[in-house]
């Protein structure tokens, strides 16, 4: 992992190795990878009982742990409706979906919510995503959603994008928890870093 003084940038490049792992995973393994994200969050965040530890960053402009969880939830809210439309409608037109936008009321509500509640919201959304993916035969992963606003996309491509997004935000969260001292006093198993956790993710899985 990066040193404790590295500026944390969610949009830092994702290595070719990580991208290859995601692209090379079969559909079942990709579902497991997406579900593991909720496990990683629970492992890291549930033992931290002081909410202030999750709402601070080391440098100005860096995301807090809470902000990273919100971003993961928001991305799930953007992507799931697209997946569902493609899976349930012939010749799905993604432009019929309203563009997802964060409104001031939800921003204010998020400010008042504990990080653990926001994590639970993300978990419920991710469970819906994975439930949808599990219900699809392999050939349905290639179904395409059409759009004039953005490039056409398949269900598989959306799932891979979620996995890359997960990696970006989990990487930043792992670094943030270290840098702000949020893990002080926790058991070693609760401080396991992302690189080690990712070794548990299968690339191929036969069910």
Question: Model-predicted segments: where are they?
Answer:
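Short, contiguous alpha-helical
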Residues: 2-13, 17, 52-101, 144-207
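A short, mixed-charge helix-start or loop-turn motif at secondary-structure junctions
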Residues: 20-27, 65, 108-115, 151-155
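Solvent-exposed interaction patches of small proteins and small membrane subunits
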Residues: 25, 29-33, 57, 88, ...
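Acidic/histidine-rich alpha-helical segments that form the ligand environment
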Residues: 33-34, 102-142, 157-162, 172
């Amino acid at each position: 992992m990066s040193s404790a003084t590295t500026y944390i940038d969610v949009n830092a490049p994702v290595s070719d190795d990580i991208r290859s792992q995601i692209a090379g995973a079969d559909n079942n393994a990709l579902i497991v990878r997406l579900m593991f994200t909720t496990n990683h969050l629970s492992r890291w965040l549930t033992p931290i009982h002081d909410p202030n530890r999750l709402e601070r960053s080391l440098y100005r402009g860096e995301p807090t742990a809470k902000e990273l969880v919100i971003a993961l939830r928001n991305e799930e809210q953007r992507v799931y409706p697209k997946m569902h439309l493609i899976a349930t409608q012939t010749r799905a037109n993604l432009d019929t979906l309203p563009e997802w936008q964060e409104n001031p009321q939800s921003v204010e509500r998020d400010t008042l919510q504990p990080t653990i509640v926001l994590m639970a919201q993300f978990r419920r959304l991710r469970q819906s995503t994975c439930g949808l993916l599990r219900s699809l035969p392999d050939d349905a992963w290639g179904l395409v959603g059409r759009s004039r606003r953005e490039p056409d996309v398949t269900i598989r491509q959306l799932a891979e994008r979620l996995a890359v997004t997960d990696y970006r935000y989990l990487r930043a969260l792992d670094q943030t928890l270290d840098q702000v001292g949020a893990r002080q006093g926790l058991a070693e198993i609760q401080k396991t870093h992302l690189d080690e956790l990712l070794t548990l993710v299968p690339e191929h899985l036969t069910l």
